Amino acid sequence: MDQKILWDCHMHSSFSADSDTPMEEMIQTAADQGLTGICFTEHFDPDYPDTPENLDFSLNIPAYRQKLESLADAFKDQIQVNFGIELGLQPQLAESFSDLLKEVPFDFVIGSSHVVHGYDPYYPSYFEGRKESACYMEYFESILENIAAFDEMDVYGHIDYVVRYGPNQNRQYSYGRYKEILDEILRTLIRKNVGIELNTGGYHYGLGEPNPCVNIIRRYRELGGEIITIGADAHTPDKISYAF
């Protein structure tokens, strides 16, 4: 018998630069779906490169916290609403992130790789003039750099995020092709007691699998990993609990 997933632990609202949805709309939709709880994980990506859309991934944390706590109280009889953050990891940000987590009592912290040496794979410029495989490898190497600098997150987000935006997506990608470095990432996370996220956004992007892919999740368990959270990475109400 299939078990229903009752929590969505990765979502965004208009407090994130890439979402226009009011927080209350996200909460109401999740409550209407019958979820037990949700966790907002608004983007905080200092040192984010310039983008064609001029996106600002800074985060007004006091305003975000105040709004969330107010709405969590208003919806307390319908759904539990937790206070999280998605940190856009880069090695030079480690100290400032550590200071932030000492100051602000987040319920849940995702650490994610969005920027690799000044480029976000979301944009084609990351892949221009290079082999797709080299771009994927650079992305995975950057995860190891980030973990070495900072390990205070609860989980590492969408470990193969880069595949969503590759020219061929996952048609030429597999766990086996990058096994050595992916195993190093997984072993390092396990040693540091950092979990991984099963991000169902991969289905939304047409991969036919979550991020990371199923074989990475299986390998994480084979290596002894025990911490797995599930989130849809929703930026709009229709993507809440997507493919759960």
Locate each region found by the language model.
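Anion (oxyanion) recognition and catalysis
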Residues: 31, 190, 221-222
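Extended substrate/RNA-proximal surfaces in nucleic-acid metabolism proteins
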Residues: 54-191
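H/E-rich (His + Asp/Glu) clusters that bind or coordinate divalent metals
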Residues: 203-244
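An N-terminally biased module of ancient metal coordination in phosphate/nucleic-acid-related enzymes
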Residues: 1-91, 100-103, 165-176, 200, ...
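Charged helix-capping and loop-helix junction motifs
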Residues: 21-24, 173-183, 209-218
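Hydrophobic residues within beta-strands of alpha/beta enzymes
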Residues: 38-40, 109, 156, 196, ...
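His/Asp/Glu-enriched short active-site or ligand-binding loop at hydrolase and phosphoryl-transfer sites
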Residues: 193-205
